[in-house]
């Protein structure tokens, strides 16, 4: 896979371009007198060291860019890599099937679970079909329908959060966007089965929270979770989206900061350079965390599960 490099990764991109050029020359002419393999190996080591140096000191704005990386794994990528026998379920049984939310039954290490997650697109047509990962009310109602089904069949629920936010269009508002989100918040707090939520990319405001009330909340290392985008915050406070880096730092949107504030449980480490560099590696780490979370929750009775979730919600914020 050809990698897309972000602005702050340009020194790495230049090194990788040199490596690609040398590799191409080596393939074209195997009779060269110089030892290209040694030079390529040296440059690869230099690239890894440079990547390690850059990623050791990332700011919140750079992490926000990584969370939006176009090659970052999405919900269906994790379904393919970490689960078996996925059977997608569609529709809210009231209006339509929102493609920005995907869901269905799968097996996690042989155990049936209900998966629900935001889904963005990669190509232009797919992005439009998925509405860039911004759900309408019917998407959240579909999610709730699947959660209620999981509760009936005593299946744990696993959600993947990756959205800029709920769709703010006129049609979505007319069909009850705020009501759909609020209902999900209420009903998720009452579910009698384990609910594990993981932010895999962008965790945008109420659009993320609508599938984010759980017994365990995890974040990938380079994901973000916030009430508004850094650009939106900057536009309100400083009347300029150019102040987004400053807003990102002030908002505390990164996984380590949210862990420090006790808003999430676990930060799942990503491969060097981000999840898009090695999707199989991050999928294995995510699967291991989900299995560990399920093991912790399986020992709780339904009453204890609900009490624990209630206390979790009551502990948010300051009194």
Curated annotation (Swiss-Prot):
A Pfam cross-reference name: ACCA
Subcellular location: Cytoplasm
Pathway(s) served: Lipid metabolism; malonyl-CoA biosynthesis; malonyl-CoA from acetyl-CoA: step 1/1
Any Gene Ontology CC annotation: acetyl-CoA carboxylase complex
Keyword Lipid biosynthesis: yes
UniProt entry keywords in alphabetical sequence: ATP-binding, Cytoplasm, Fatty acid biosynthesis, Fatty acid metabolism, Lipid biosynthesis, Lipid metabolism, Nucleotide-binding, Transferase
GO molecular function, one term: acetyl-CoA carboxylase activity
Enzyme superclass (EC): transferase
One Gene Ontology biological process: fatty acid biosynthetic process
Main location: cytoplasm
Location of the CoA carboxyltransferase C-terminal domain: 35-296
Domain of life assignment: Bacteria
PROSITE patterns, per database record: COA_CT_CTER
Record-listed E.C. numbers: 2.1.3.15
Catalytic reaction annotation: N(6)-carboxybiotinyl-L-lysyl-[protein] + acetyl-CoA = N(6)-biotinyl-L-lysyl-[protein] + malonyl-CoA
HAMAP family: AcetylCoA_CT_alpha (MF_00823)
Annotated PANTHER family: ACETYL-COENZYME A CARBOXYLASE CARBOXYL TRANSFERASE SUBUNIT ALPHA (PTHR42853), ACETYL-COENZYME A CARBOXYLASE CARBOXYL TRANSFERASE SUBUNIT ALPHA, CHLOROPLASTIC (PTHR42853:SF3)
Annotated family: Belongs to the AccA family.
Subunit structure: Acetyl-CoA carboxylase is a heterohexamer composed of biotin carboxyl carrier protein (AccB), biotin carboxylase (AccC) and two subunits each of ACCase subunit alpha (AccA) and ACCase subunit beta (AccD).
Function: Component of the acetyl coenzyme A carboxylase (ACC) complex. First, biotin carboxylase catalyzes the carboxylation of biotin on its carrier protein (BCCP) and then the CO(2) group is transferred by the carboxyltransferase to acetyl-CoA to form malonyl-CoA.
Protein name: Acetyl-coenzyme A carboxylase carboxyl transferase subunit alpha
Taxonomic source organism: Enterobacter sp. (strain 638)
């Amino acid at each position: 896979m050809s990698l897309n490099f972000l602005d702050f990764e340009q020194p790495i991109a230049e090194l990788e371009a040199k490596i690609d050029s040398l590799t191409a020359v080596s393939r074209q002419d195997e009779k060269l007198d110089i030892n290209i393999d040694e030079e390529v190996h040296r440059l690869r080591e230099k690239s890894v060291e440079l990547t390690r140096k850059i990623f050791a000191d990332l700011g919140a704005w750079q992490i926000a860019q990584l969370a939006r990386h176009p090659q970052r794994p999405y919900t269906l990528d994790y379904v393919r890599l970490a689960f078996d026998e996925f059977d997608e379920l569609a529709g809210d049984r009231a209006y339509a099937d929102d493609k920005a939310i995907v869901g269905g039954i799968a097996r996690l290490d042989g155990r049936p679970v209900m998966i629900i997650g935001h889904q963005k697109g990669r190509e232009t047509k797919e992005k439009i079909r998925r509405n860039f990962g911004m759900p309408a009310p019917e998407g959240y109602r579909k999610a709730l329908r699947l959660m209620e089904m999981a509760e009936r069949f005593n299946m744990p629920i696993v959600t993947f959060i990756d959205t800029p936010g709920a769709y703010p269009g006129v049609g979505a508002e007319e069909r009850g966007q705020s009501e759909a989100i609020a209902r999900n918040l209420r009903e998720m707090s009452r579910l009698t089965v384990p609910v594990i939520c993981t932010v895999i990319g962008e965790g945008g405001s109420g659009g993320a929270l609508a599938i984010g009330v759980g017994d365990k909340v995890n974040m990938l290392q380079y994901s973000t979770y916030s009430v508004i985008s850094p650009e939106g915050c900057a536009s309100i406070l400083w009347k300029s989206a150019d102040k987004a880096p400053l807003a990102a730092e002030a908002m505390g949107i990164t996984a380590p900061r949210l862990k420090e504030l006790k808003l999430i449980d676990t930060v799942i480490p990503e491969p060097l350079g981000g999840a898009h560099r090695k999707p199989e590696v991050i999928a294995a780490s995510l699967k291991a965390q989900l299995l560990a979370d399920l093991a912790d929750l399986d020992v709780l009775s339904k009453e204890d599960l609900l009490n624990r979730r209630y206390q979790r919600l009551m502990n948010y914020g300051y009194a």
